[in-house]
Design a protein with these regions (language model features):
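Acidic/His-rich, divalent-metal-binding segments that scaffold phosphate/diphosphate chemistry
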Residues: 115-144
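Active-site beta3 strand of CheY-like receiver
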Residues: 46-52
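Active-site residues of response regulator receiver
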Residues: 10, 54, 82
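Two-component/phosphorelay signaling modules centered on CheY-like receiver
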Residues: 4, 13-31
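Receiver (REC) domain active-site loop signature in two-component systems and cognate sites
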Residues: 57
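C-terminal output helix
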Residues: 85-88, 106-116
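Helix N-cap/capping motif at the beta->alpha junctions
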Residues: 13-14, 31-40, 62
Length: 144
């Protein structure tokens, strides 16, 4: 199992349970049944490496959720997974939510596992780049 948390957000409990069942041996999985619950989990438990959100949920849609997550936790890699797609939804998700991947349901376990491996690699790159930049800045300040 990886040390990186992945948060799945979907208003359909059976989908969350299926993801957890398929992936729990390999990944550290957290789940939320709404965008509001996801934000609360992140507030209490801290950021996760990857968030996978459904698009259409009551209260707050996935684009709004991922936009807030990006503002609060810029290192978190974001994935949109939805059964209902149209061009405007995809464009809004990419432009507003700055997502890593936009995928449609259903998605097979092998494809999902591969996607999550890629997302964790992206998270590692983001955090390593920021750490390197921080160390470079500290070194520059010390030289001055």
């Amino acid at each position: 199992m990886t040390d990186y948390d992945i948060l799945f957000v979907d208003d359909e409990l059976r989908i969350l349970q299926a993801f957890e069942r398929q992936l729990r041996k390999r990944f550290s999985i957290r789940t939320a049944e709404s965008a509001q619950e996801a934000l609360k989990i992140l507030e209490v438990d801290g950021p996760c490496a990857v968030i996978v959100s459904d698009m259409w949920m009551p209260g707050m849609d996935g684009i709004k959720l991922l936009t807030q997550v990006k503002n609060l936790y810029p290192n978190t890699v974001q994935i949109m997974l939805t059964a209902h797609t149209d061009q405007k939804t995809a464009i809004d998700a990419v432009n507003c939510g700055q997502i890593f991947k936009f995928l449609t349901k259903p998605i097979g376990p092998e494809a999902l596992t591969s996607l999550l491996d890629s997302a964790i690699r992206e998270y590692r790159l983001i955090t390593a780049e920021k750490e390197l930049l921080s160390q470079t800045l500290k070194g520059s300040v010390n030289v001055l």
